[in-house]
């Protein structure tokens, strides 16, 4: 099924992703004790610690992932790839992100790629959520000192960090459309997708009204193709879709949802079963602070966290114009509405409950 992206920040209103929830329920997932990264950890959660992982503790030489992917991508398109073409790709961007160049900016800075975005996808959002915390998608300021950072030369770690025992908060990967990807399970050890907390694209909003995925955005493969990644883990290694970069059947994966490719470089895959995305950090990272990969951008809440709205199902989300949004939901056979306008400094809400009661709220950001 064809999936479209448009170079503007507001989503269009067509649904193009098949609902995998019914199929996944048949799979029987082994659920661990992860916390949903978008939610506050429970009291039983592992206390915040700081674990520094040295870049010298590696089991493989560092590799230039951009150069390797660029070579593979060019080879798939033409047998006449030149080294100068690959070098130009390395200097300009990371493969995959180039398909979203109008809304996602990538540039080299020292040993890292800096990635800037507003965190909102071009596809629609929120539709299909049946377990809703009353948070809504807002554009974020992932830029400048708050941009995403991906190592230019990732390396395998002697001591990988498993998402089953840590990384309970924050992102563990970044999709090539600029949307962060969080861990998969909520603070009750439940699969967030299977229990209805995610929309048809595998995302929802966190406490800061920040939209993010909790499963692999496999739908992006229809845009970038099999030869390019759909995301990158925060350790710098690429995440491909459900096939190998050459289009062949996906090979056996390790506990982190990855393996060494035919090019000799490690990469992850997105899957339709847990862990869906990278199952942790197989590569070297600078540290884990407060149960999240550090450093990474912050998304700070500007209002009190929402509470679960029992019996509500989100039925529609739209953006009639830039900076204006509307979310519709059904509850007990009636329709509720959240309309809001966003500027650089403020957010104004109008809430219409299923009973018809109207309230307004305004916040500074």
Region annotations inferred by a language model:
Residues 1-22, 27-38, 46:
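N-terminal secretory signal peptides
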Residues 40-69:
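Short, low-complexity, disordered segments immediately C-terminal to signal peptides
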Residues 86-138, 224-357:
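Extracellular glycan/ECM-engagement signal in secreted proteins
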Residues 154, 185-187, 215-219, 243-245, ...:
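A mature extracytoplasmic/lumenal domain signature
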Residues 177, 207-220, 263-274:
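Extracellular/lumenal glycan-associated surfaces
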């Amino acid at each position: 099924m064809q999936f479209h992206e448009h170079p503007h920040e507001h989503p269009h209103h067509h649904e193009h992703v098949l609902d995998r929830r019914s199929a996944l329920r048949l799979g029987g997932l082994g659920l661990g004790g992860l916390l949903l990264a978008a939610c506050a950890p429970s009291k039983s959660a592992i206390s915040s610690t700081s674990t520094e992982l040295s870049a010298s503790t590696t089991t493989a030489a560092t590799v230039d992932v951009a150069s390797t992917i660029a070579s593979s991508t060019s080879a798939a398109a033409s047998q006449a790839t030149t080294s100068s073409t690959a070098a130009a790709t390395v200097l300009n961007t990371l493969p995959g992100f180039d398909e979203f160049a109008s809304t996602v900016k990538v540039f080299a800075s020292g040993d890292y790629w800096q990635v800037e975005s507003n965190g909102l996808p071009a596809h629609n959002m929120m539709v299909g959520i049946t377990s809703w915390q009353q948070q809504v998608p807002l554009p974020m300021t992932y830029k400048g000192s708050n941009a995403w950072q991906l190592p230019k030369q990732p390396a395998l770690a002697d001591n990988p960090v498993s998402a089953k025992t840590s990384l309970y908060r924050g992102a563990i990967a970044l999709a090539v459309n600029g949307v962060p990807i969080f861990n998969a399970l909520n603070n009750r050890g439940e699969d967030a997708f299977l229990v209805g907390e995610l929309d048809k694209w595998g995302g929802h909003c966190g406490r800061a009204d920040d939209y993010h995925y909790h499963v692999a955005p496999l739908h992006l493969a229809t845009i970038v193709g099999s030869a390019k990644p759909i995301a990158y883990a925060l350790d710098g290694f690429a995440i491909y879709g459900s096939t190998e970069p050459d289009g062949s059947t996906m090979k056996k994966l390790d506990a982190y949802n990855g393996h060494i490719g035919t090019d000799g470089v490690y990469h992850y895959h997105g899957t339709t079963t847990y862990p869906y995305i990278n199952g942790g950090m197989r590569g070297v990272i600078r540290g884990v602070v407060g149960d999240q990969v550090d450093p990474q951008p912050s998304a700070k809440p500007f209002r009190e966290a929402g509470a679960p709205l029992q019996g509500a199902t989100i039925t529609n989300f739209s953006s009639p114009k830039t900076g204006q949004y509307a979310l519709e939901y059904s509850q007990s056979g009636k329709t509720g509405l959240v309309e809001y306008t966003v500027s650089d400094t403020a957010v104004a809400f109008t809430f219409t409950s299923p009973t018809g009661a109207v309230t307004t709220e305004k916040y500074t950001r």
